[in-house]
UniProtKB/Swiss-Prot annotation:
Localization per Swiss-Prot or TrEMBL: Cytoplasm
Taxonomic lineage: Bacteria, Pseudomonadati, Pseudomonadota, Gammaproteobacteria, Vibrionales
Homology family: Belongs to the P-Pant transferase superfamily. AcpS family.
Entry protein name: Holo-[acyl-carrier-protein] synthase
Keyword terms, alphabetized: Cytoplasm, Fatty acid biosynthesis, Fatty acid metabolism, Lipid biosynthesis, Lipid metabolism, Magnesium, Metal-binding, Transferase
Primary residence: cytoplasm
Organism of derivation: Vibrio cholerae serotype O1 (strain ATCC 39315 / El Tor Inaba N16961)
Length: 126
């Protein structure tokens, strides 16, 4: 049974401009330490950050809160399995809310094309 659905789209150029203005401080607001390592290794840092931003916004919407009510960007970590499938790991208040919703499965899809990055998150319980 689906208990949450969230979608977000981010304009890559807008994220690149925020990075140019604020430098790494902007990235640190969005990314966890493990994601920052990947960010530094990325050849397209603006695109990388836009995809993570969209994924975390989509996840927060699926929980029903958005980035508010104690839920922060750092409550979400995006990684990948060995085949490249994106994985969403929850911590902090986001993990607590997911537990209250009895979430057992999290599905994350991330896509980007020229100007935009988008993500969809589905939360399921049995």
């Amino acid at each position: 049974m689906i208990v949450g659905l969230g979608t977000d789209i981010a304009e890559i150029e807008r994220v690149e401009k925020a990075l140019a203005r604020s430098g790494e401080n902007f990235a640190r607001r969005i990314l966890t330490d493990s994601e920052l390592e990947q960010f530094h290794a990325s050849k397209q840092q603006g695109r990388f950050l836009a995809k993570r931003f969209a994924a975390k916004e989509a996840a927060s919407k699926a929980l029903g809160t958005g980035i508010a009510q104690g839920v922060t960007f750092h409550d979400f970590t995006i990684s990948h399995d060995k085949l490249g499938k994106p994985l969403l790991i929850l911590s902090g208040q986001a993990a607590e809310l997911a537990s209250q919703l009895q979430v057992e499965n999290i599905h994350l899809s991330i896509s980007d094309e020229r100007h935009y990055a988008m993500a969809t998150v589905i939360l399921e319980r049995r």
